[in-house]
Amino acid sequence: MADVYLVKAVRPRYDKSESLVNKIPELMEKAGIKDVVKDGDVVAIKVHFGVRGGYRIIRPQFIRAVVDVVKGLGGKPFVTDTWGLNHVYDAYYNGLSYATLGAPVIPANGIKENDFRVVKLDEYYWLSEVEVAGNIYDADVLINFAHAKGHGGAGYGGVIKNIALGCVTQRTRRAQHSKEREVGVKAFHEAMADVVKAVLSNKQGKVFHMLWIMDVVEHCDCTAFGMIPLVPDIGVAASKDLVSIEKAGLDLINQAPSVPGSVADKYGLKPGENKFLRIHGRDPYVQVEVAEKAGLGSSQYKLIEL
């Protein structure tokens, strides 16, 4: 069983010290960031840059708070995502830059997605080789800062998807999606687990996961639009266990009431329902199950609210 820490979006009083952004340092400290980031470490902060037209990505001030924590520990952070140089322009358009974040914003696998390291797996579901983004592979530490939201192919995109589809080359992304078309959704989830295993293969004890459970919409951040969040903002979670934080995030979303006027109205979603299964017809908990089976973490967790 792993600990998952949560700072809730609803704060107990109107005070600067209770700001969700200002609680990020405490959240990261409680979740064990000091065990992960050491003085001199080069730290990749993996987020989704979004695209032009979309506006539900993690807000810059939250990423800046993570950058500042890393700097305070002597780390050398950079903020990153794949898709090459064009995606960096998307990041700038969406307000993610050195000026706003206090760290370089660079493509994870080069300006044309040609910078990668081939990682071979001895045990895998479908993919024996994975092309890991070079800057992710070379970094000493990976902070996996994901946005909890829906995903048309996987049903849900959280910390697993942020690595599986966001830390590799276009060829590896296509290899995962092809399993959905050729075999089925579970095979897609299994291929994602293969990729996560490969990406984290040289990061033992040097990975930290964060989940922004805010603006929880039914679509991915790669879409050029934004819809009304389907549940109220829940908060920000952190853990050193990938599977535990993913399971906790899904549970919190499913326990939450729906937001009137959102896609939840169309499906009549109620607290306790598997919301993304209803919306996309794909069970996101399969991601959790296959990742746990692959040895990537535990689905048993203890939720600790700060």
Q: What are the roles of these predicted feature ranges?
A:
Residues 2-54, 58-63, 67-306:
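Extended, low-polarity segments enriched in aliphatic/aromatic residues
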